[in-house]
A protein has these predicted regions:
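Helix-turn-helix
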Residues: 148
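Acetyl-CoA-dependent GNAT
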Residues: 9-106, 110-112, 123-125, 129, ...
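Conserved G/P- and acidic residue-centered "switch" motifs that form tight phosphate/ATP-binding loops
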Residues: 117-119
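Conserved catalytic-core motifs of GNAT/GCN5-like acyltransferases
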Residues: 137-143, 153, 158-176
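Conserved GNAT acetyl-CoA-binding A-motif
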Residues: 123, 130-143
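Active-site beta-loop-alpha junctions enriched in small/polar residues
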Residues: 107, 143-145
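Short hydrophobic/aromatic beta-strand or adjacent loop that forms the aromatic wall/cage
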Residues: 64, 175-179
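Eukaryotic N-terminal targeting leaders
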Residues: 1-6
Length: 186
């Protein structure tokens, strides 16, 4: 099986031009899969762009790590928008009592590139980076019953439980949320 792509850390000086492509993958996951992912239909392109710009700003101050999955990478490190096929983020809020915790957010894979190991590649890179930063307890949530729930189980995340009616679905109605954690060894 060929490699799912190349995982690269987001660098604001090299990758800020990808903001519309990040927003497009996010929008596709909401409209195509009805994923609970921050926004409801009808989507506002401006809201999505603004949301991603805020996340990008957090990468610049060290509170957030963003990893990109790309189909190819040229030697300069510059990525063309269509080469972007996935993203995942690690949020690392300041906490003296929880400096070892990190929160996995927005594991999003373009619909045409799923089932090829991209989620595994992104999560493996995220876990390595989390370890390097001393974040040994990872927490996340996802919509119950979706593909991501099965992916996180396969990747060794332990289910904490389900919360009924946790989020509003873009398809309408409330959906349950499943919470996971994983302890990383240093």
């Amino acid at each position: 099986m060929p490699a799912p792509g190349v995982v690269v850390p987001f660098d604001i000086s090299l990758h800020s031009h990808l903001t519309p492509y990040l927003a497009a993958i996010h929008a596709s996951c909401i409209t195509h899969d009805h994923t609970i992912a921050t926004f409801l239909l009808p989507l506002s392109h401006e809201k999505l762009l603004s949301w991603w710009k805020e996340r990008i700003a957090e990468t610049n101050d060290g509170r957030r790590l963003m990893l990109l999955l790309v189909s190819e990478l040229d030697p300069s490190g510059r990525i063309k928008g269509p080469e972007l096929i996935g993203v995942v983020m690690l949020w690392m809020p300041y906490s003296e009592t929880g400096s070892f915790r990190g929160y996995v957010e927005k594991l999003l894979i373009h619909k045409h590139h799923r089932g090829k190991g991209g989620a595994r590649a992104l999560m493996s890179a995220l876990e390595a980076e989390a370890r390097n930063r001393g974040r040994t307890l990872l927490l996340l949530d996802t919509e119950s019953g979706n593909q991501a729930e099965a992916v996180f189980s396969r990747l060794g995340y332990t289910e904490l439980g389900k919360v009924p009616g946790y989020g509003m679905s873009p398809a309408g109605g409330l959906k349950d949320g499943t919470f996971f954690y994983k302890t990383l060894e240093l």
